[in-house]
Amino acid sequence: MRIIMIGPPGSGKGTQTQLLSKYFHIPCISTGEILRKEIKKNKKTKKYIKKTINKGKLIKNSFIIKIIEKNIKKKKFFNGFILDGFPRNIEQAKSLSKKINIEYIIYLKIKYDDIIKRITGRLIHASSGRTYHKIFNPPKIKNKDDITQEKLCSRNDDNEKTIKIRLQEYKKHTNPLIKWIKKKKKIKFIEIHANQSIKIVNKKIIYNINNNNINK
């Protein structure tokens, strides 16, 4: 099974990817985690990625396509995966669809006002990418990761000004992508309203996949 999770920043892609990975027993591929690994490799890459993300912009296609496709080829992903945060535009989707057969695309839809509320309260475990929220999904111990007990932090780009830029980028690139996906008969497109609890969103995703419900 090959599943792709798309949606605006703050829609809960990372959280739902982790939950689906456990339920279906298939590995997940996090675009954010891949970029964090790339940052560690050399200073030039680190500078470019951090500068781009902090501005709320998208990583250039040639760079992100290359590293995502390189990771997908790893042996552990041969029998399926859940990909979070890629593709983000039509060019990326076209490139990916030439390499693999995508079975499901899960689109988490949410109002932009709700996104700003979610992101401004978001907490991150830096080394793993696990996400929490001060109100909607708090850690068991305040400001500490549930698994490692390490301190949580906020992302530099999790401020209202940068969020609005990221949402503008999203509308510009990803809205046309969704229209493109809906035209592809071989891809099963599932749209879920993400302004519900994590548990309800997860149940709806699993129900739609198991019952082969699609929104086209």
Swiss-Prot record:
Family membership noted in the UniProt record: Belongs to the adenylate kinase family.
GO cellular component, as recorded: cytoplasm
Spans annotated as NMP: 30-59
Record InterPro entries: Adenyl_kin_sub, Adenylat/UMP-CMP_kin, Adenylat_kinase_CS, Adenylate_kinase_lid-dom, P-loop_NTPase
A GO molecular function held by the record: ATP binding
Domain remark from Swiss-Prot or TrEMBL: Consists of three domains, a large central CORE domain and two small peripheral domains, NMPbind and LID, which undergo movements during catalysis. The LID domain closes over the site of phosphoryl transfer upon ATP binding. Assembling and dissambling the active center during each catalytic cycle provides an effective means to prevent ATP hydrolysis.
Residues the record lists as binding AMP: 31, 36, 57-59, 85-88, 92, 155, 166
GO biological process, any: AMP salvage
Function according to Swiss-Prot or TrEMBL: Catalyzes the reversible transfer of the terminal phosphate group between ATP and AMP. Plays an important role in cellular energy homeostasis and in adenine nucleotide metabolism.
Involved pathway(s): Purine metabolism; AMP biosynthesis via salvage pathway; AMP from ADP: step 1/1
Annotated EC: 2.7.4.3
Region entry LID, spans: 121-158
Compartments, as annotated in UniProt: Cytoplasm
SUPFAM superfamilies linked to this entry: P-loop containing nucleoside triphosphate hydrolases
Catalytic activity from the UniProt record: AMP + ATP = 2 ADP
Name the UniProt record assigns to this protein: Adenylate kinase
Superkingdom in the source lineage: Bacteria
Organism: Buchnera aphidicola subsp. Cinara cedri (strain Cc)
Residues annotated for ATP binding in this entry: 10-15, 122, 131-132, 196
Quaternary context: Monomer.
Taxonomic lineage from the root: Bacteria, Pseudomonadati, Pseudomonadota, Gammaproteobacteria, Enterobacterales
Matches recorded under Gene3D superfamilies: P-loop containing nucleotide triphosphate hydrolases (3.40.50.300)
Keywords: ATP-binding, Cytoplasm, Kinase, Nucleotide biosynthesis, Nucleotide-binding, Transferase
Primary gene name: adk
